[in-house]
């Protein structure tokens, strides 16, 4: 099996294993993170109602000032932006869902930026 295919299968197994254990509510939504080679996305999800409360990514208009969207600086920008959106909706605590990705690099940078901006997790 090709190395990239094996890495994807491993990530999906990790994702399913973790997703069984965490649930977001309206008071404490799930902060879901997804990264691709060029972009990073974050969502606040209420699993009990099945709705997305807030979302942002490097594709949003506030990220147009970034020269490159697939690096740690872009992840920090998205982390601060999602924390700001959460504050607007009076959300202070979240459950962090790294979506099967390792807690390293861009995922860690987004989480740290969200914590510095006031989100508790």
Curated annotation (Swiss-Prot):
Which GO cellular component term is one of those annotated?
Answer: cytosolic large ribosomal subunit
Instruction: Return the SUPFAM superfamilies for the record.
Output: Translational machinery components (SSF53137)
Sample GO molecular function, one term? structural constituent of ribosome
The biological processes this protein is annotated with in GO are: translation
Q: Which UniProt keywords apply?
A: Ribonucleoprotein, Ribosomal protein, RNA-binding, rRNA-binding
- Could you tell me what this protein does? This is one of the proteins that bind and probably mediate the attachment of the 5S RNA into the large ribosomal subunit, where it forms part of the central protuberance.
- What family name appears in the similarity comment? Belongs to the universal ribosomal protein uL18 family.
Q: How does it assemble?
A: Part of the 50S ribosomal subunit; part of the 5S rRNA/L5/L18/L25 subcomplex. Contacts the 5S and 23S rRNAs.
What is the protein's name according to its record? Answer: Large ribosomal subunit protein uL18
**Highest classification ranks of the organism:** Bacteria, Pseudomonadati, Thermodesulfobacteriota, Desulfuromonadia, Desulfuromonadales
């Amino acid at each position: 099996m090709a190395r990239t295919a094996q890495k994807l299968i491993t990530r999906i197994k990790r994702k399913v294993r973790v997703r069984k254990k965490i649930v977001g509510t309206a008071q404490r939504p799930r902060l879901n993170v997804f990264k691709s080679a060029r972009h990073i996305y974050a969502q606040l999800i209420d699993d009990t109602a099945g709705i997305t409360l807030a979302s942002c990514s490097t594709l949003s208009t506030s990220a147009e000032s970034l020269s490159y969207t697939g690096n740690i600086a872009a992840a920090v920008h998205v982390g601060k932006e999602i924390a700001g959106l959460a504050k607007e909706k009076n959300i202070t605590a979240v459950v962090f869902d790294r979506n099967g990705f390792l807690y390293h690099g861009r995922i860690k940078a987004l989480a740290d930026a969200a914590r510095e901006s006031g989100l508790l997790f």
